[in-house]
């Protein structure tokens, strides 16, 4: 039991779980301050604020962090071509350190000793929230109800939560709950649990909320020119209608709209959680998918081959660290600086077509291009001397010849 005047900042979503947690924390003697981040999710923020106050929150912070989310978290991931296990674009993993930053700032402003969240004890988010909070404020204490026996034994299922909510006047959903859980932000939406826990089950068509069905999407593509500077998108132009956006947030929102219209960004995967288990997740990442393809193309066009090989390794490690919750770790800071340095000449424009669930690169140009049209031309010899290739091939063949010479000897001895 906490002292009556202990204050806790709760990462509040407005949903059933965190509403019940808010009331439960008050039962334990805490003074509760609720924080709800507007990170691009579909939410009635005024209603959520009124609900938290009605349930006994001393104060409710609602902060729009969308621009910060794009510039400080999504853009570094775009520069890195970040993908976890080759497919997941890290939408939830990137949002957590952004939210953690504000949880800590509010706790410090309010003099709160505690931070609380509603993440489950089996998932990655508990790790991401807490590592972020501890890194930014080592003295903070975290309350994680879904890891506390006195909480999860009292509420083993949704039925018990509903009964608790009704008893304490917590508004409960009047519409049937979707048979899966969802988490949404500006970058993506995820679906997991429920009927999706069986990896064999096909996701129903009505599951998807952020993108149109690719098979019924428009029959005319949208063509975009995306301009990059130092690996970051700075301008997008729709070549069909001339619409242009330059600010980070407006650019990203516009790409979300275009990708959503054409059903771009869906993926259904089984991934390895940091806590050790495999889980099935379905994700929609519309704008992120367009930017991944466009950035990958301009990077290959402007970056030295050997530097890019090193950078690919850095990107793999960066993606792993972000997924596992180490955004504020020294190793992740180091990687962000290295990746940013690799992007100094990654500038230019990529022309893409967005159509029927796909992103097609149509062309690219850059003032820093390492592509030499004359050098590579089949019609012009240029500065390249074809005869030089003979020595190059002979030197590279030497190792192969020696290896197979030895293999022949070993094989002969084994046959004797």
Swiss-Prot record:
Alphabetical UniProt keywords: Amino-acid biosynthesis, Arginine biosynthesis, ATP-binding, Cytoplasm, Ligase, Nucleotide-binding, Phosphoprotein, Urea cycle
InterPro entries: Arginosuc_syn_C, Arginosuc_syn_N, Arginosuc_synth, Arginosuc_synth_CS, Arginosuc_synth_type_1_subfam, AS_cat/multimer_dom_body, Rossmann-like_a/b/a_fold
EC category: ligase
Reactions that this protein is recorded to catalyse: L-citrulline + L-aspartate + ATP = 2-(N(omega)-L-arginino)succinate + AMP + diphosphate + H(+)
Enzyme Commission number(s): 6.3.4.5
Binding-site list for L-aspartate: 120, 124-125
Sites where the protein binds ATP: 11-19, 37, 116-124
Pathway(s) this gene product operates in, as recorded in its UniProt entry: Amino-acid biosynthesis; L-arginine biosynthesis; L-arginine from L-ornithine and carbamoyl phosphate: step 2/3; Nitrogen metabolism; urea cycle; (N(omega)-L-arginino)succinate from L-aspartate and L-citrulline: step 1/1
Gene Ontology annotations of biological process type: argininosuccinate metabolic process; L-arginine biosynthetic process; urea cycle
Positions of modified residues (Phosphoserine): 181
Binding site for L-citrulline: 88, 124, 128, 181, 190, 271, 283
Cellular component annotations (GO), alphabetically ordered: cytoplasm; cytosol
Single GO MF descriptor: ATP binding
Domain of life where this protein originates: Eukaryota
Keyword Ligase: yes
Function: One of the enzymes of the urea cycle, the metabolic pathway transforming neurotoxic amonia produced by protein catabolism into inocuous urea in the liver of ureotelic animals. Catalyzes the formation of arginosuccinate from aspartate, citrulline and ATP and together with ASL it is responsible for the biosynthesis of arginine in most body tissues.
HAMAP family: Arg_succ_synth_type1
Family: Belongs to the argininosuccinate synthase family.
The name this protein goes by in its record: Argininosuccinate synthase
């Amino acid at each position: 039991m906490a002292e009556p005047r202990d204050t806790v900042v709760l990462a509040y979503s407005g949903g059933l779980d965190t509403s019940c947690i808010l009331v439960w924390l008050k039962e334990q003697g805490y003074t509760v301050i609720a924080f709800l981040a507007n990170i691009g999710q579909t939410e009635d923020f005024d209603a959520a604020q009124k609900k938290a106050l009605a349930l006994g929150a001393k104060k409710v912070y609602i902060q729009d962090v969308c621009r910060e989310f794009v510039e400080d978290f999504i853009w570094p991931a775009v520069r890195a071509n970040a993908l976890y296990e080759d497919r997941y674009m890290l939408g939830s993993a990137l949002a957590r350190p952004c939210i953690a930053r504000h949880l800590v700032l509010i706790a410090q402003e309010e003099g709160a000793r505690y931070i609380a969240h509603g993440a489950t004890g089996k998932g990655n988010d508990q790790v991401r929230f807490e590592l972020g909070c501890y890194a930014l404020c080592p003295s903070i204490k975290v309350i994680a109800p879904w890891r506390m026996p006195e909480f999860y034994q009292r509420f083993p299922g949704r039925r018990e939560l509903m009964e608790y909510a009704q008893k304490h006047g917590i508004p409960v959903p009047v519409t049937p709950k979707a048979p899966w859980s969802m988490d949404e932000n500006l970058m993506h939406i995820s679906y997991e649990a429920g009927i999706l826990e069986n990896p064999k089950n096909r996701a129903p068509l009505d599951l998807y909320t952020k993108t149109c069905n690719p098979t019924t999407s428009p029959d005319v593509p949208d063509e975009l020119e995306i301009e990059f500077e130092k690996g970051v998108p700075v301008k997008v132009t729709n070549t069909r209608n001339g619409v242009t956006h330059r600010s980070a947030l407006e650019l990203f929102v516009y790409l979300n709209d275009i990708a959503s219209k054409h059903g771009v960004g869906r993926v259904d995967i089984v991934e390895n959680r940091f806590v050790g288990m495999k889980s099935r997740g379905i994700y929609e990442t519309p704008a992120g998918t367009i930017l991944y393809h466009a950035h990958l193309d301009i990077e290959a066009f402007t970056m030295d081959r050997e530097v890019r090989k090193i950078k690919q390794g850095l990107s793999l490690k960066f993606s792993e660290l972000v997924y596992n919750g180490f955004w504020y770790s020294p190793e992740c800071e180091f990687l962000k600086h290295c990746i940013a340095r690799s992007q100094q000449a990654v500038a230019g424009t990529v022309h893409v077509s967005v159509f029927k669930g796909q992103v097609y690169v149509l062309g690219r140009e850059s003032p820093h291009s390492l592509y030499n049209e004359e050098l590579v031309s089949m019609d012009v010899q240029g500065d390249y001397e074809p005869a030089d290739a003979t020595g190059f091939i002979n030197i590279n063949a030497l190792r192969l010849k020696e290896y197979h010479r030895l293999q022949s000897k070993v094989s002969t001895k084994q046959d004797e």
